[in-house]
Amino acid sequence: MHPNVETFIGCDSSYRAASIVLYGAPYDSTTSYRPGARFGPAAIRHESYGLETYSPYQNADLTDFDIFDSGDLELCFGSSESALADIEARAAEILHDGKFPLLLGGEHLVTLGAVRAAVKKYPDLHIVHFDAHADLRDDYLGAKLSHACVLRRCHELVGDGHIHQFCIRSGDRTEFEFAAQHTELHKFDFTGLSELTAQLCDSKVPVYLTIDLDCLDPSCFPGTGTPEAGGVSFLQLLDAIRTVTKANIIAADLNELAPTLDTTGVSTATACKVLRETLIALDKGWPGFQV
């Protein structure tokens, strides 16, 4: 696997030496409101060179760790299933090589491809989901493969009690009714995350972490396809990431930056910092990092 031409800052390890591998899925063909998430991965990489590799929040530096950036997949915008198959194949390759796959979206549907790969290796997989939206619709305008349905499709893979949702503040009534029966849904913020993390640590179950950046309040992150008022702050998200990464996280993704929707550049800068902090939290040697 060869490195991308423009890598995320500090992620210049070789593939052989790396413990974490970045890969991008620039896909937004099912976006229901404002498109542009396909430009997210490239924007994050490009703008990262205005960011320091050092994190004052965690007193660690990206260059302390071995992280490889494999670049973006070439995905078929006309076929969601084809795109998901390509994402699954790349995630499976990284997992097979004993490394940690971290996916950059793209719209949230891309998560399904990565989860398909993860659940084949880890049948008892749990999913921790940060998002403004429940994403539990059975279909959206007749489409089963939609960013609005991604956690419903993931539920079909992992089953009841294996999906833990936080910051949810948008969805139709049927989604919340479904969640009450089949997932663990926490509205508005990260209340309950510390208790969940303790349970996940005790059980040592494998965990997939998916972060939709629209969990952030639009005042600090307006550049996303479906912004929702009332989100969490950057510091709240950082604290949540540092908390949940104590569990046995085996793969993760970061998605839904649409950089062209925020010409100030604030959203892209925020996404860069969230990615830096996530990489450091994952690779600081937490007991849970057990790929």
Please state what every model-predicted region is:
Residues 1-291:
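Conserved alpha-helical scaffold segments that buttress catalytic/binding sites
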